[in-house]
Amino acid sequence: MPFRSELWTEVKDFKFQDLTYHRAKEQGTVRIAFNRPEVRNAFRPQTVDELFTALEHARTTPDVGVVIITGNGPSPKDGGWAFCSGGDQRIRGKDGYKYENSERGATQKMDLARLGRLHILEVQRLIRFMPKVVMAVVPGWAVGGGHSLHVVCDLTLASEEHAVFKQTDPDVASFDSGYGSAYLAKMVGQKRAREIFFLGRNYSAQEAFDMGMVNAVVPHADLENVALEWAREMNSKSPTAMRMLKYGFNMVDDGLVGQQLFAGEATRLAYGTEEAQEGRDSFLEKRPKNFSKFPWHY
């Protein structure tokens, strides 16, 4: 999946070390890419901080409708490709993943409350609740926490030649009992989801597609072009409709939080009606409200 730099402009508001962040020149799409190919794009706390920052920036940029999450490559060690291989096990402590001295400076005092966090879960929630389409573009390995990350995205495109899906949580005494497993079961069924976690086998892009957890299998060389074409199509849609559709899809699985998000957006839409304006104006003008001209729709 060659990165076609001529199609993108770097977002220079940030100084990321573990990610690259670009915006498409001809559409409202951003590309957030893990940039640790030498370790299969495994994430450390700094990586997750940067990912959250980039996603939040994309969320609050009003002319961006689609967010692509992918992984840079290939690895300088063996030429392999990866989306993300989950948490870097070398820095996992007894209560989570640790910031390294080099990440914050050996002399800088660390806030103890930041230590030992599983804040990749905060990233999952941001992806889930973001009122925009988040698309995983998987050029290679999607493993462990990286597998869960693609699961929580709205769509997944996968490299025909290099994508591998694998859940290693039980092998390293970890488990994602939230979106990474329960939402996966909604996609592929309970039996297949349990197989994926309990056995930890490798699945090709085609096998993942056949199960229902991948939207399209794409030749590796075409992956970025296809992702941009999908993004272009989605960016041409009504932003309000896309937002409400995402929240509607999510609501059945997200309990009262999902209901609140959907209802909040519905309330905001209602504020734009003449009926809502009559309610507001009658209050401000201190007169009796008159909703008689508004029908009880059926």
Show which residues each predicted segment covers.
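Well-ordered beta-strand positions
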Residues: L155, E195, L199-R201, E207, ...
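Glycine- (often His-adjacent) and acidic-residue-rich active-site loop
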Residues: G71-V123, A173
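C-terminal long alpha-helix characteristic of the crotonase
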Residues: D78, A158-A163, F175, V214-L261, ...
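CoA-thioester-processing core
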Residues: E122-F129, V137, V143-F197, M211, ...
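Intrinsically disordered, low-complexity segments enriched in small/flexible residues
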Residues: M1-K12, F262, A270, E275, ...
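Conserved CoA-thioester-binding segment of acyl-CoA-metabolizing enzymes
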Residues: M1-K77
